[in-house]
From Swiss-Prot:
Keyword Cytoplasm applies: yes
Keyword match Cytoplasm: yes
One Gene Ontology cellular component annotation held by this UniProt entry: cytoplasm
Protein name, entry field: Endonuclease NucS
Organism: Corynebacterium jeikeium (strain K411)
PANTHER family with a match to the protein in the record: ENDONUCLEASE NUCS (PTHR38814:SF1)
Function comment: Cleaves both 3' and 5' ssDNA extremities of branched DNA structures.
EC category name: hydrolase
Main location: cytoplasm
Keywords (A to Z) from UniProt: Cytoplasm, DNA-binding, Endonuclease, Hydrolase, Nuclease
MF (Gene Ontology): DNA binding; single-stranded DNA endodeoxyribonuclease activity
Family: Belongs to the NucS endonuclease family.
This enzyme's EC code(s): 3.1.-.-
Cell compartments where the protein resides: Cytoplasm
């Protein structure tokens, strides 16, 4: 993982266009090929990012001489720019990062992460819900448990009665962190044209009021699971709010 703290401005060029004006930011380059831009707020959420696979081309501004500058460079206001980083994904979308000054540039090999280990109840809830997917509603079907994504596995990926994709996040005690996690998964999965549109279900034995409010505000359905009933019968009880 490479962490660069720099004064930079960023332009996203693709289906939409977005611009971040010059400011001090953290640029995070992970071993999986992802690139994300962070400010000193917003908790863990990046200002902009590019999911893997993508390529990174870094060019010194001093190497350009008049007409030799690439189109990506000449299109940008580049006074005082030291480097231009061009991050491109297979669809041709780009992050164009103009570096004015680098304050810190460090790289660390974190090795392979063992991943999040769920407690026994959460793991069993996931297993039981996958076996009794109709708890989520009539006509639901299971696509896969632990559906892999670039930011971690989705507990359960399913289809509803209309065939639409539904991502399910399972917790023993559902808090705001779980809703944020589901939000990240749904945002990422909706970028996949084969899965979109993707909605979310937040399922837990107990859902905290603040988490329920946030989940519903983001369009997620909340399901309270009866663990004892799920363990003891083929058809589990639940409460929908």
């Amino acid at each position: 993982m490479r962490l660069v703290i720099a004064r930079c401005c960023v332009d996203y060029v693709g289906r939409l266009e977005a611009h971040l004006p010059p400011a001090d930011r953290l640029i995070l380059l992970k071993a999986d090929g992802s690139v994300s831009i962070h400010a000193d707020d917003r908790a863990y959420k990046p200002l902009n990012w590019m999911m893997p696979p993508c390529s990174l081309e870094a060019v010194e501004a001093s190497s350009f001489d008049g007409d030799d500058a690439p189109t990506e460079y000449s299109e940008l206001g580049n006074e005082g720019v030291e480097q231009l980083w061009i991050v491109t994904n297979p669809k041709g979308e780009q992050l164009r990062i103009q570096i004015f000054e680098i304050y810190s540039d460090t790289e660390h090999d974190l090795g392979e992460d063992p991943g999040l280990v769920k407690d026994g109840v959460e793991a069993h809830l996931q297993e039981l819900l996958a076996e009794q997917i109709e708890i989520l509603g009539e006509g639901y079907s299971l696509i896969r448990r632990e559906y892999p994504t670039a930011i971690g596995p989705v507990d359960i990926l399913s289809k509803d009665s209309t065939g639409a994709t539904v991502a399910v996040e399972i917790k023993r005690r559902g808090g705001i962190d779980g809703v944020e996690q589901l939000t990240r998964y749904v945002e990422l999965l909706n970028r996949d044209e084969l899965l979109a549109p993707v909605t979310g279900v937040f399922a837990a034995q107990e859902i905290k009021p603040q988490a329920r409010t946030l989940a519903e505000d983001r369009g997620f359905r909340c399901v309270t699971l009866d663990y004892e009933a799920m363990r003891g019968t083929d058809s589990s009880e639940l409460r929908l709010f």
